[in-house]
Amino acid sequence: MTIAVIAVVGLFFLAMGIHAIAAPAILVRPFGIRLDQAVSRAEVRAVYGGFGLAMAAVLALAAFHPGSLRTGITVTVAAALGGMALGRLMSALLGDRTPFYPNWFYCFVESVAAAALLLTDYR
Protein backbone atom coordinates (compact mmCIF):
# COMPACT_ATOMS: atom_id res chain seq x y z
CA MET A 1 0.00 0.00 0.00
CA THR A 2 2.84 2.39 0.83
CA ILE A 3 4.37 2.09 -2.63
CA ALA A 4 0.96 2.57 -4.26
CA VAL A 5 0.34 5.82 -2.35
CA ILE A 6 3.80 7.13 -3.16
CA ALA A 7 3.35 6.17 -6.83
CA VAL A 8 -0.07 7.84 -7.17
CA VAL A 9 1.10 11.08 -5.56
CA GLY A 10 4.31 10.95 -7.58
CA LEU A 11 2.38 10.52 -10.82
CA PHE A 12 0.18 13.50 -9.89
CA PHE A 13 3.29 15.65 -9.47
CA LEU A 14 4.88 14.26 -12.63
CA ALA A 15 1.77 15.06 -14.68
CA MET A 16 1.53 18.55 -13.18
CA GLY A 17 5.20 19.20 -13.85
CA ILE A 18 5.10 18.04 -17.45
CA HIS A 19 1.88 19.97 -18.11
CA ALA A 20 3.32 23.15 -16.60
CA ILE A 21 6.49 22.92 -18.67
CA ALA A 22 4.67 22.10 -21.91
CA ALA A 23 1.59 24.32 -21.61
CA PRO A 24 1.79 26.75 -18.68
CA ALA A 25 -1.11 28.94 -19.84
CA ILE A 26 -3.46 25.97 -20.07
CA LEU A 27 -2.43 24.74 -16.62
CA VAL A 28 -3.39 27.98 -14.86
CA ARG A 29 -6.36 28.95 -17.04
CA PRO A 30 -8.95 27.42 -14.62
CA PHE A 31 -7.69 29.87 -11.97
CA GLY A 32 -8.28 32.90 -14.18
CA ILE A 33 -4.56 33.56 -14.56
CA ARG A 34 -3.34 34.92 -17.89
CA LEU A 35 0.24 34.42 -19.02
CA ASP A 36 0.74 37.23 -21.50
CA GLN A 37 4.47 37.68 -20.94
CA ALA A 38 7.47 35.38 -21.18
CA VAL A 39 8.38 36.10 -17.56
CA SER A 40 4.98 34.91 -16.33
CA ARG A 41 5.23 31.70 -18.37
CA ALA A 42 8.73 31.13 -16.99
CA GLU A 43 7.41 31.58 -13.45
CA VAL A 44 4.68 28.97 -13.91
CA ARG A 45 7.16 26.58 -15.52
CA ALA A 46 9.48 27.04 -12.54
CA VAL A 47 6.97 26.93 -9.69
CA TYR A 48 4.55 24.34 -11.04
CA GLY A 49 6.79 22.58 -13.55
CA GLY A 50 10.12 22.41 -11.78
CA PHE A 51 8.55 21.84 -8.37
CA GLY A 52 6.27 19.10 -9.72
CA LEU A 53 9.15 17.29 -11.42
CA ALA A 54 11.32 17.58 -8.30
CA MET A 55 8.55 16.17 -6.09
CA ALA A 56 8.02 13.30 -8.53
CA ALA A 57 11.75 12.55 -8.46
CA VAL A 58 12.06 12.46 -4.68
CA LEU A 59 8.89 10.36 -4.40
CA ALA A 60 10.40 7.89 -6.91
CA LEU A 61 13.47 7.77 -4.67
CA ALA A 62 11.27 7.15 -1.63
CA ALA A 63 9.49 4.28 -3.37
CA PHE A 64 12.76 2.35 -3.61
CA HIS A 65 14.37 3.28 -0.28
CA PRO A 66 12.39 2.19 2.78
CA GLY A 67 13.31 3.45 6.20
CA SER A 68 14.22 6.91 7.39
CA LEU A 69 14.86 8.30 3.90
CA ARG A 70 11.37 7.29 2.76
CA THR A 71 9.85 8.69 5.94
CA GLY A 72 11.68 12.00 5.55
CA ILE A 73 10.58 12.36 1.95
CA THR A 74 6.94 11.44 2.55
CA VAL A 75 6.68 13.78 5.54
CA THR A 76 8.30 16.63 3.60
CA VAL A 77 6.08 16.19 0.53
CA ALA A 78 3.03 15.86 2.80
CA ALA A 79 4.00 19.15 4.48
CA ALA A 80 4.27 20.86 1.08
CA LEU A 81 0.83 19.56 0.06
CA GLY A 82 -0.63 20.53 3.43
CA GLY A 83 0.81 24.01 3.02
CA MET A 84 -0.90 24.38 -0.34
CA ALA A 85 -4.24 23.31 1.14
CA LEU A 86 -3.70 25.65 4.11
CA GLY A 87 -3.05 28.56 1.74
CA ARG A 88 -6.40 27.91 0.07
CA LEU A 89 -8.14 27.83 3.45
CA MET A 90 -6.43 31.05 4.54
CA SER A 91 -7.58 32.73 1.32
CA ALA A 92 -11.17 31.79 2.17
CA LEU A 93 -10.77 33.07 5.73
CA LEU A 94 -9.50 36.37 4.35
CA GLY A 95 -12.69 36.76 2.37
CA ASP A 96 -11.82 35.36 -1.04
CA ARG A 97 -14.78 33.13 -1.85
CA THR A 98 -14.24 30.73 -4.73
CA PRO A 99 -16.27 28.04 -6.48
CA PHE A 100 -15.63 24.36 -5.78
CA TYR A 101 -13.59 23.92 -8.95
CA PRO A 102 -10.74 24.51 -9.16
CA ASN A 103 -9.88 25.85 -5.70
CA TRP A 104 -11.71 23.46 -3.37
CA PHE A 105 -11.23 20.48 -5.66
CA TYR A 106 -7.47 20.93 -5.42
CA CYS A 107 -7.68 21.66 -1.69
CA PHE A 108 -9.37 18.27 -1.29
CA VAL A 109 -6.80 16.50 -3.50
CA GLU A 110 -3.90 18.12 -1.65
CA SER A 111 -5.36 17.27 1.76
CA VAL A 112 -6.06 13.64 0.87
CA ALA A 113 -2.62 13.20 -0.68
CA ALA A 114 -0.92 14.76 2.36
CA ALA A 115 -2.86 12.55 4.77
CA ALA A 116 -2.19 9.44 2.69
CA LEU A 117 1.55 10.15 2.61
CA LEU A 118 1.65 10.75 6.36
CA LEU A 119 -0.16 7.49 7.01
CA THR A 120 2.06 5.38 4.74
CA ASP A 121 4.77 4.84 7.33
CA TYR A 122 2.46 4.70 10.35
CA ARG A 123 0.68 1.36 10.28
Regions from the language model: what does each represent?
Residues 41-63, 79-80:
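Core segments of alpha-helical transmembrane spans in multipass integral membrane proteins
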Residues 117-123:
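Juxtamembrane boundary at the C-terminal end of a transmembrane helix
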Residues 23-41, 91:
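Cytosolic, membrane-interface loops and tails of multi-pass inner-membrane proteins
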Residues 12-13, 53-57, 110-117:
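Hydrophobic cores of alpha-helical transmembrane segments in multi-pass inner/ER membrane proteins
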Residues 3-20:
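N-terminal signal-anchor transmembrane alpha helix
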